[in-house]
Amino acid sequence: MNLLSPPRRRTLAVLGAVLLAACSPSGPKFEASDITGSSFGRDFSLEDPKGVTRSLADFRGKAVVLFFGYTQCPDVCPTTLATLAQAMQRLGPDADRVQVLFVTIDPERDTPALLAQYVPAFDPRFLGLRGDAAATARTAKEFKILYEKVPGATPGSYTMDHSAGTYIFDPKGRLRLYVAYGQGPDVYAHDLKRLLDASS
């Protein structure tokens, strides 16, 4: 993934400041930014690799980890998915109460078959989701995700600039946390454990 342009970096910095300001002073203590009560990120309607339309309601009862990326991403996406796989290992049996979702921002190249191969390679419980160009744009807007195609040497060799953070929902389907890119598996495992314990 290429670095975002200065205006986009400023936009993300502003968003980060807003997210930090939203931290709740009470309740469980999280390592990530507590964004409980946010008015964005309410839901999505996307298809899994089998063509089944999915929304947050399908995963009620589980903590949901939502990440936006693309399969040909050279760094951020595989790093984040590998980190999440390590977090699942740290959670032990509790990992079965967590659903990691990978939403592609490159539906042009990320076919259902490719998502079915790529995403579970990190952990067989991980699920890839996609929509057409309009659904992708609509979902990205709902979750304040920035993405942009960066032309390559050939029409099919483009890359994608995109926001690199991760969202976490509690088992009741409420958006609770924003995890900045670069956080390790212990941060995810710690915060997911707290959300799961609070819902027990």
Describe every region a protein language model picked out.
Residues 2-18:
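N-terminal secretory signal peptides and thylakoid transit peptides that target proteins
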Residues 44-64:
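A short beta-strand-turn-helix
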Residues 24-27:
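Bacterial signal peptide processing site
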